[in-house]
């Protein structure tokens, strides 16, 4: 990595102060009309041409519109956005569009290279910086100053959800046997990858990461976690594993305060769904929604 991106303290040289002329007591640059729309607790997001949908490149990406929504709502131009599980650069693209600085991290070098190459293909913005770093999220504190991050936003690996052969049970009939059928699409086989862990181990490791991120976040800075519940098929009739509740409990034990829960309505992204559980085991389609958990770092007492 080029030395010029680091300062004399070996931290990333990146601005984190707002560059807009908005009043300092405003949370962001958003106007009242947009604020009103953002108060709706159920939100839809749509994929665009720039989004990565090929699961051979990355098994699970959220739309650029999702981080864009929160970056626009919770930060000013020039402020710093952090994604500890950056994947192929979705959050970086959103930050570039909105004139925010952003740093993301990922364990997998292929994802990091892909993300940074995506940025190079865009028109440069001389006033902001966006970069993805190849390192463990546990080490993020080595790269950034305390009280420098205005927003943390991410979609972490959902424990070992992808670490099994894909059966596409939520798809209809013959549509189940698509190009991804019977394939394992996990993020990596790195033992440090949260996507290889059982649920309780996943929650503990996620908490360890967010405890280290806590000093980096400014007071009243927000942290958004996109999470879904899991379904355990190892027992008769299956059982729901409430990952969102476990995440809330862990985050609050660290010191984060839950502010909002937004439902990501994914029905516009789910097509040709199949039937399962009928006629004696009612199970909701987990693919139709996810939880967007909004925490902040409260003011010191």
Q: Which ranges hold each PLM region?
A:
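Class I S-adenosyl-L-methionine-dependent methyltransferase catalytic core
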Residues: 1-301
